[in-house]
Amino acid sequence: VTGVFHPLGSSLNKLRSYWVVLAIGVCSTLNSSLVLAHPHGWIDLSVRVITNDEGIATGLHQTWRMDPFYSLVVFEELQQVQGSNLQEGLDQLGSDIRDNLSQQHYFTEIRVNGEPQALGEVSEYTALERDGRLTFMFILPLATPQPLAGRMLEYQVFDPTYYIEVVHEEEDGAPSEQALILYGEPDCRLSVLPADPDPELVMQAALLDVDETGESGLGRHFAETGRIECD
């Protein structure tokens, strides 16, 4: 699909065509324009805020679970690679995902007391199969560790073009207890705030076909916000 960035990278470009095939097939059956609307896949997200013994935040440990359909396609593609087993394919895929995400700031924005924070480079990561889902785990460091006491840290994780939707892990229609966690000091209140996009932006996303790219930054308006407020 021309012009659509995907974190899985160029090594799996063929996978993008599956979204087109699925959309066209369903659309021809249901005659629904919504099938072609963005987003075309999703990631279930969970985040652990990493702090040291002094209660200083050093980064975010993120776990991404790709949606079941996309996961199935990825596993089938990897198993067809000759001379390589699934785990070897996943190891290479993890490297590809990391390299492609680095060009997009790992789909992550972090603010402390409203001030944007510079991010470090990801060196710890892994891709694996878990319960039939492609799961990518990585530690995203802050370029400068930040004390949390008396401050508020917020983050958003989103695909800038909104081709993929990123949502925190849910349970009974609300963020699960494991969607955002922080162990140790300081004492903080954790919450996940829902997105509240302008109706015009919702319509804009709905009008985008599967082979079209939303303007950069569109995904920010649909992003949930993780908030850590510390005493």
Language model: regions and residue ranges:
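N-terminal secretory signal peptides that target proteins for export/translocation
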Residues: V1-L15
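Boundary at the C-terminal end of the N-terminal hydrophobic targeting segment
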Residues: V35-A37
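Sec-dependent N-terminal signal peptides
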Residues: W19-V26
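Early extracytoplasmic/domain-onset interaction patches
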Residues: P39-L72
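Structured domain cores in non-transmembrane regions
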Residues: F69-L148
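Mature, soluble, non-transmembrane domains
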Residues: N113-D231
